[in-house]
Amino acid sequence: MNYQTIAYNVTDGVARLTLNRPERLNSFNAQMHEDVRHALAALQSDDTARVLVLTGAGRGFCAGQDLSDRTVAPGTERADLGASIERHYKPLILALRRLPIPVLAAVNGVAAGAGANLALACDLVVATRSASFVQAFARIGLLPDSGGTWFLPRLVGPARALGLALLGEKLPATQLAEWGLIWRCVDDEDFTAEIDSLAAGLAAAPTLALRRIKQAVHAAWHNTLEQQLDLERDAQRELGYSADYAEGVAAFMAKREPRFTGR
């Protein structure tokens, strides 16, 4: 499919989705929502994809909502922002979280508003040292959406979550990596190589195990310890019968690189 606002392809097990409105810092309009929704639906049914890399074109990752888009811009008739969230952002965040494969956010510049929370919805967030994050909502009279009020306190605690949300300060990715909000920062000149290396490594990893790891960590946010122990038991039982486990042990004993198939 020819997309108007994104680039999407799958090569060697790595799916890449690039938000492609660099002149607007890759902010979302109605067309971009449609394009991303279609790409994620295609990804769901693509058995060759083993990892998704989400990034932005140009100097920004994503500036959130394009406020000039007529569907959300204030005018004579006030736009229903709740309807926009229900139609676009809620399905987007849930679709990302529910993907069975690892999702890697490659934050190459500013991540603002819903764009920041789009990154936080991913499993791994790697940013350039020059990148920045800002919860810009309060500056225009709104609250963090796209899961912001859910992700922030869980990742950095209520004190820092409230500071980020109430003050709307732009903070460097280096500081947020120190806080544990994102996985790591990488020198700008090494960023592309680092993302490619991480993506290739995840694509070559035991897919079924990664899927169960992702599910278990997400479930831990609401499970009791006993429920989590039961989940680990059931998942480990399944993985213990997998071809990838047999291959992993055989490769370890033979001192060779494993060749995982995702089975």
Task: Locate predicted features.
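Charged catalytic carboxylate motif
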Residues: Q31, D35, H88, A95, ...
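Conserved CoA-thioester-binding segment of acyl-CoA-metabolizing enzymes
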Residues: M1-A57, L94, T192
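Crotonase-fold acyl-CoA enzyme core
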Residues: I6, L94-L210, R237-S242, E247-A250, ...
